[in-house]
From Swiss-Prot:
It is found in: Cell membrane. It is a multi-pass membrane protein. One of its GO terms (biological process) is cell wall organization. Belongs to the PopT family. InterPro entries: VCA0040-like. GO terms for cellular component: plasma membrane. Flippase that catalyzes the transport of undecaprenyl phosphate (UndP) across the cytoplasmic membrane, from the external side to the cytoplasmic side. Is involved in UndP recycling during peptidoglycan synthesis. Necessary for peptidoglycan maintenance. Pfam families: VCA0040-like. This is Polyprenyl-phosphate transporter. It comes from Staphylococcus aureus (strain NCTC 8325 / PS 47). PANTHER family: INTEGRAL MEMBRANE PROTEIN, POLYPRENYL-PHOSPHATE TRANSPORTER.
């Protein structure tokens, strides 16, 4: 029987933290921490005979993700608005650092053929197209007003965001940006944390969409991981590489920003590369 693992709260916290940043995927962090396959299988199995082991695996991860989103939403609003370039350079370093781990676990040197490399290219292209779809202001002021059409929009946005969240390289928060609701959702989270529940209906609409997206997309991903593993990993590698296009904030504008951005980029790269090596050694 699957046991409740306290360490998974920390792993969930890391996943939740990454999902606050447009362009950075919680699925990427799950891969880096070595829990991606089990995470997908557990979500897929929550409405099956594997309910209890799936439930006990997911609960600490969900707790960690909620803690991260509740405690860090204001911080990330500040970092992304006031220190956008260094923040995104840090996450760019994290993303690049995971690529060697992905190449290693996919055993690409002996397993990949032309079709797999074409799938990598397709994954990169998909991320570039998704990035170009977003032309809105990531940090524009938002209100908490609601209408029937907006509730439907938030539900669909949540559904697409959770589906993206499960795929390494595609950020759930970035999909919220594509739908133009990222600022509103972040504001709603911040207000609910302050015990102002005016944003609760928005979070409920998004939350139900997230739940529906998790259930549907996890079963699809689980199927492809089981029956088309190499092609799936090739697509994932493409998504991760393509996500660099999404997180690239532009070049620093002065010497100090260049220095800070390069330092945090290197830190992110080293952290990701080290975690990838540790995970690979423990598999």
């Amino acid at each position: 029987m699957q046991q409740f693992k306290w360490i998974n709260i920390l792993k969930g916290f890391a996943m939740g933290t990454s999902d606050l940043v447009p362009g950075v995927s919680g699925g990427t962090i799950a891969l880096l921490l070595g829990i991606y396959n089990q995470f997908i299988a557990s979500i897929s199995g929550i409405f099956s005979r594997r309910f209890w082991p799936s439930f006990t695996f997911l609960i600490p991860i969900i707790i960690g993700m909620l803690l991260a989103m509740g405690s860090l939403s204001n911080l990330f609003n500040y970092l992304l608005s006031q220190h956008h370039i260094p923040t995104m350079f840090f996450f760019g370093g994290l993303i690049i650092g995971i690529v060697p781990y992905l190449l290693k676990i996919s055993n690409y040197k002996t397993s990949f053929t032309t079709k797999h490399y074409m799938m990598v290219i397709a994954g990169i292209a998909i991320l570039i197209v998704i990035t170009l779809m977003n032309n809105g202001d990531k940090h524009a002021g938002e209100t908490l007003t609601l209408s029937t059409s907006l509730i439907i929009k938030y539900f669909i946005a949540g559904m697409c965001a959770s589906s993206a969240m499960l795929l390494p390289g595609i950020s759930g928060s970035f999909m919220l940006l594509v739908f133009g609701v990222y600022g509103t959702v972040m504001l709603a989270i911040s207000e609910v944390v302050k015990l102002n529940f005016a944003g609760l209906p928005i979070l409920l609409a998004v939350g139900f969409g997230v739940l529906a997206g998790f259930i549907i997309s996890s079963k699809i991903i689980q199927y492809f991981l089981t029956h088309h593993k190499l092609m799936t990993f090739a697509l994932i590698i493409g998504f991760v590489v393509g996500s660099l296009f999404a997180v690239f904030p532009g070049l620093p504008t002065n010497i100090v920003m260049w220095f800070v951005s390069l330092v945090v980029f290197i830190i992110g790269f080293i952290v990701s590369l080290t975690l990838g090596r540790i995970t690979a050694e423990n598999e």
